[in-house]
Amino acid sequence: MNLIPAIDLMNGKCVRLFKGDFNKRKDFTKEPHEQAKFWESEGAKCIHIVDLDAAKTGSPTNDKSIKKIAKTVNIPIQIGGGIRSQERIEQLFSYGIEKVIMGTSAIENKELVKDLSNKYPGRIIVGIDAKNGKVSTRGWLEQSNIFATDLVKEFSSFKIASFIVTDINTDGTLEGTNEEFIKSILEITDIPVIASGGVGSISDLLSLVKFENSGLFGVIVGKALYENKFTIKEANNVLSSERLNDFDLNRNYYA
């Protein structure tokens, strides 16, 4: 299971939201490309970027920062936020982005996802953001009546790289993940799953290890890293397969 550090962009800055609320945002001082480079030096194997401005409006405004990150690091980058056309995807690929995340567009235009996953197999990720099990779109500003599990079933026949599933109620809280939600997704798909939302300690990471053999490929972490709850080096050390037996999964490490 891989730890994937997150960079959420607003107005060219690194920010974090609380439960997806744009009015509850916290800005961080490092420039996005500096933050990405630091995490690469800590041992990150991939960087997760979300363009929050684009997610909200559909119009990309952080491309300068995105390009700079892509030029600064030598590890794969996956990016989401306002990606709603083939033209936008190809533009991001031209910047050096490895994979793109389709969220709102996946729900509103499933044929586009199917076509693009056929054209770019293994490079399209479907992002599913859910609140109380139901999907939210457009930067989490709109709530649907569609169950996340129904979408996962539908997209599991596509040639996508993975699902990223976010539990909005835990995102930015540092209070732990929604294990039942994660489990419900893993039970219905053979496609790799990346979980997001709620990780606040090493113990939270360890609690997800049991899902690794069920298809949990990685976990996205943002606020906990920014606020120094633990480091990527510490997490990688703990999550390395040869070290897991050293830890009591019921004990609270670095809480």
From Swiss-Prot:
Cellular component GO terms held in the UniProt record: cytoplasm
InterPro entries, alphabetized: Aldolase_TIM, His_biosynth, HisA_bact_arch, Isoase_HisA-like, Isoase_HisA-like_bact, RibuloseP-bd_barrel
Location of the active site: D8 (proton acceptor), D129 (proton donor)
Alphabetized UniProt keyword annotations: Amino-acid biosynthesis, Cytoplasm, Histidine biosynthesis, Isomerase
Record CDD domains: HisA
This protein's name: 1-(5-phosphoribosyl)-5-[(5-phosphoribosylamino)methylideneamino] imidazole-4-carboxamide isomerase
Lineage, top ranks: Bacteria, Bacillati, Cyanobacteriota, Cyanophyceae, Synechococcales
Catalytic activity, as annotated: 1-(5-phospho-beta-D-ribosyl)-5-[(5-phospho-beta-D-ribosylamino)methylideneamino]imidazole-4-carboxamide = 5-[(5-phospho-1-deoxy-D-ribulos-1-ylimino)methylamino]-1-(5-phospho-beta-D-ribosyl)imidazole-4-carboxamide
Location(s), subcellular: Cytoplasm
Family stated for the protein in its record: Belongs to the HisA/HisF family.
